[in-house]
Amino acid sequence: MFAVIKTGGKQYRVAANDLIKVEKVAGEAGDIVEFAEVLMVGSTIGAPTVAGSLVTAEVVEQGRGRKVIAFKKRRRQNSKRTRGHRQELTTIRISEILTDGAKPSKKAAEKKAPKADAAEGEAAKPKKAAPKKAATKAESAE
C-alpha cells in the first residue's frame, strides 16, 4: 500500500520501508516522526486530507543538499556577484502507513520513549562553574 504525504510544501508518494529526502524535519537520527497530512492512501483520496490516517517514519540522518550557485551579472557595469546555497535536508525511512485512526506499532513507540527519558536526565544535571584563574605575576606585583 502507498500513501501521498505533504511536508515542507511538497508532496511525496511513499510506501513502507521507502528511504526519502525531505525538507528539514526536527529530530535527531533514530527519532520517530509522524506525518498527519496524508493526502491519499491507496485508492482513497482525501478532501483535502484522509481523516484518521497517519504515516510514521524514522529519521535516518540530517544533512545538506548539493550547492546551488546563484550568479548575478550586470552587463557593461563590471559588476557581478556569486552566491551559494545548500538546503537543509532530512533523510527518513517510512515505518508504516496507518489508516482509520490506528495507533503506531509498539516498535515505534519503544524507540520514542527512551529518547524522552534521556533528555530529562540531561536537563536535571547542573553545569559546573569554570575554575578561577590564578593571579599572574604582573597582577600580584601591583
UniProtKB/Swiss-Prot annotation:
GO MF, one term, reads: structural constituent of ribosome
Q: Which terms under GO biological process does the entry name?
A: translation
Is Methyltransferase set as a keyword in this record? no
Annotated segments matching region Disordered: 74-142
Tagged with keyword Ribosomal protein: yes
* Ranges of Basic and acidic residues composition bias in the record: 107-125
- Its biological function? This protein binds to 23S rRNA in the presence of protein L20.
Q: Kindly give the PANTHER family that the UniProt entry links to this protein.
A: 50S RIBOSOMAL PROTEIN L21 (PTHR21349), LARGE RIBOSOMAL SUBUNIT PROTEIN BL21M (PTHR21349:SF0)
Relate the assembly described in the record.
Part of the 50S ribosomal subunit. Contacts protein L20.
Q: What is this protein called?
A: Large ribosomal subunit protein bL21
What are the top taxonomic ranks of the organism?
Bacteria, Pseudomonadati, Pseudomonadota, Alphaproteobacteria, Hyphomicrobiales
